Amino acid sequence: MPVQGSQRRLLGSLNSTPTATPKLGLAANQTGAQCLEVSIPDGLFLSLGLVSLVENVLVVAAIARNRNLHSPMYCFICCLALSDLLVSGSNMLETAVILLLEAGALAARAAVVQQLDNVIDVITCSSMLSSLCFLGAIAMDRYISIFYALRYHSIVTLPRARGVVAAIWVASILFSTLFIAYYDHVAVLLCLVVFFLAMLVLMAVLYVHMLARACQHAQGIAQLHKRQRPAHQGVGLKGAATLTILLGIFFLCWGPFFLHLTLIVLCPQHPTCSCIFKNFNLFLALIICNAIIDPLIYAFRSQELRRTLKKVLLCSW
């Protein structure tokens, strides 16, 4: 992840400097301005990561176990869970290494720590990119299933889904490696921000279009059965509420992180922006919260998956 300054948090922990850069974030503001800084304890950070890790491991295990779930839709959901798993796991690993370095329980040279930091950054960045891509893929899959229902199984085949999955993983790893290598270039930050905005617009357009189709369908059924308008309005309100929750969670969890990147480009030295930079760990914690919420939205709502999950848990005992 892009940072401002010559040190990242792992190196700062190794050198035991009091002004070490927060995890993958920006250096503290030295202007003396009063800032609202939300501190995220390492224990809370590890706890959030552990919850996300367990949830997403269960999703992957359930989908892998049940052959009925080996469909394109669940393929994308499984890969989303795997991406979220890597996001949480990489941040837990970094936090654990930092704690060990600060406690003196782990001895390592600066060069080794730098390489480890680079590897963790690549894993974190690639898993974030792939997570966003799979959210878009799930939205596209649902869109095709609604608007091209009769041709869905000929359009979205398992081999094509696997090809999309492979392309997303390869592209995520490639671009994340380039982003980490050239993190101090403005173009890199702009590319990340544009990518986030593109995914946000794509998801909003697709889900709004699906909501409109659902309302039209409900209206047609109401007219067919000569029902009153409240039934149609109820469907519209329920769909709008679901859409607001889905896109709202996406924006609230991912938006601050990309706002952080945008401000690095627009006002890297401004005191107000520097105050926002201090809360980078909070923004990262929000992304991990999104990794906790994703299984609840996309996976655990499936009865088939829940039944398989119960079998997985019973077998583990």
Swiss-Prot record:
Keywords: Cell membrane, G-protein coupled receptor, Glycoprotein, Lipoprotein, Membrane, Palmitate, Receptor, Transducer, Transmembrane, Transmembrane helix. SUPFAM superfamilies: Family A G protein-coupled receptor-like. A lipid is attached at C315 (S-palmitoyl cysteine). Residues 64-72, 141-163, 212-240, 301-317 are cytoplasmic. One of its GO terms (molecular function) is melanocyte-stimulating hormone receptor activity. Receptor for MSH (alpha, beta and gamma) and ACTH. The activity of this receptor is mediated by G proteins which activate adenylate cyclase. Mediates melanogenesis, the production of eumelanin (black/brown) and phaeomelanin (red/yellow), via regulation of cAMP signaling in melanocytes. One of its GO terms (cellular component) is plasma membrane. It is found in: Cell membrane. One of its GO terms (biological process) is adenylate cyclase-activating G protein-coupled receptor signaling pathway. Glycans are attached at N29. SMART domains: 7TM_GPCR_Srsx (SM01381). Interacts with MGRN1, but does not undergo MGRN1-mediated ubiquitination; this interaction competes with GNAS-binding and thus inhibits agonist-induced cAMP production. Interacts with OPN3; the interaction results in a decrease in MC1R-mediated cAMP signaling and ultimately a decrease in melanin production in melanocytes. Residues 1-37, 94-118, 184-191, 267-279 are extracellular. PANTHER family: G-PROTEIN COUPLED RECEPTOR (PTHR22750). It is a multi-pass membrane protein. The keyword Cytoplasm does not apply. It comes from Presbytis comata. InterPro entries: GPCR_Rhodpsn, GPCR_Rhodpsn_7TM, Melcrt_ACTH_rcpt, MSH_rcpt. The chain crosses the membrane at residues 38-63, 73-93, 119-140, 164-183, 192-211, 241-266, 280-300. Belongs to the G-protein coupled receptor 1 family. This is Melanocyte-stimulating hormone receptor. Gene3D superfamilies: Rhodopsin 7-helix transmembrane proteins.
